[in-house]
Each structure stands twice: as C-alpha cells, then as structure tokens.
Amino acid sequence: MEPTFEQYVEGSGALLRCPACGGNHLHHAKIEVFDRKDDENTGLHVSVTNGKVFEDKDLTGNPSSRRHGLSICFKCEHCPATPVLTIAQHKGNTWVDFK
C-alpha cells in the first residue's frame, strides 16, 4: 500500500494517513530495527513495545532483503486497520512502504 501524507508544514512535517481509511490518527504500537551488513545472514533485531525492549539475532520480518530495515506498527483510531510502515535499504536506495 502506498504511504500518503497530508500537506507538509514547515517545522512540523506532514501527517501520515491510514492506508485503509485515510484517517490521520495513527498510534505507534511496536517499533522494530533490523541491523546487518551487506547480504549477511545474521544481524541485530531490536523491538520496542509497551515500554519494553527486546533484542535478538532473528532477522525474520526485516523489510530489506539485503541490509538495514525499520518497521513501525500502527493502530488507527478511525478503523480496525493495523498498518505497518516499513523502511528498507537496498543497493543505496531507501524504500518506504505500508504492509
């Protein structure tokens, strides 16, 4: 799903819209960071949710097939959607997507 934003406001940024309903009240539920070198099978996975930090070497769910990745899980106030915003590094490019 394509990420969409409201109009950019200098100094604040732009509000992210829910990909399901278009609402702008998305709450972070879980944040995941994946760190690894080029094409390595192992790396570091850090997950933050409900005030707790978890660390392991499991790269399952990394939005990047080769390098670093981020996932931000949201809950929408306007609909039952739980979209996941992903940021993936791939061959010098940064890809942003909703899953």
What are these regions (language model features)?
Residues 82-85:
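Beta-strand-rich cores of mature extracytoplasmic or soluble domains
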Residues 11:
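Non-catalytic beta-sheet/beta-sandwich ligand-binding modules that flank or precede catalytic cores
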Residues 2-4, 14-17, 23-71, 88:
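Short recognition patches in nucleic-acid-associated and regulatory proteins
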Residues 20-22, 77-80:
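Cys/His-coordinated zinc-binding microdomains
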Residues 89-99:
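A short, surface-exposed interaction/processing loop segment used at functional sites
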